[in-house]
Amino acid sequence: MEEATRMRRNDRAMDDGWIRAFLATAPVGVVSTVDDGQPFLNSNLFVYDESRHAIYVHTARTGRTRGNIEAVERVAFTAFEMGRLLPADEALEFSVEYAGVVAFGRATVVADAEEAGEGLQLLLDKYAPQLRPGRDYRPITPDELRRTSVMRIDVSEWSGKRKEAEPDFPGAFRYREPAPGGS
């Protein structure tokens, strides 16, 4: 494991197969870029392309994310989900279930129209798998590709981790649900 993705709790580390499966279903990712030393985060729909070991996102043709990537190609990416809250007898012992991936790599704005179209189609396939181009919607056109930015993050290193408590963990509850025994 590389230095940037080294974990303190190796008992929660997940393998590459788990990471790929998690990225296939995680609904939202966050891309971290830098502008003149100022970190910037942008939440995006995303898709992991196993054949390229890359993450695709798309954004507006102009904007901070694209400008930051054009200036500094090194980025970080994360996708995560929160499970149940795990109460305890002491405040500092409260915990939470979670699963997530952190990736580092180099991002580029995809200039090749064919690859940009493939990246957008992968996004559509992930988020609307029941719909097919040419049957349920008009396929992506060259004009549409010129009106958006498709970005590819070539993953250089990644890590995944998960914490999951027993199903019968005393008092466990989901955020924004009433706690067991609460009002």
Language-model features, listed with the residues they occupy:
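A generic structural signal for nonpolar/aromatic side chains embedded in well-ordered alpha-helices
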Residues: 23, 68-69, 123, 153
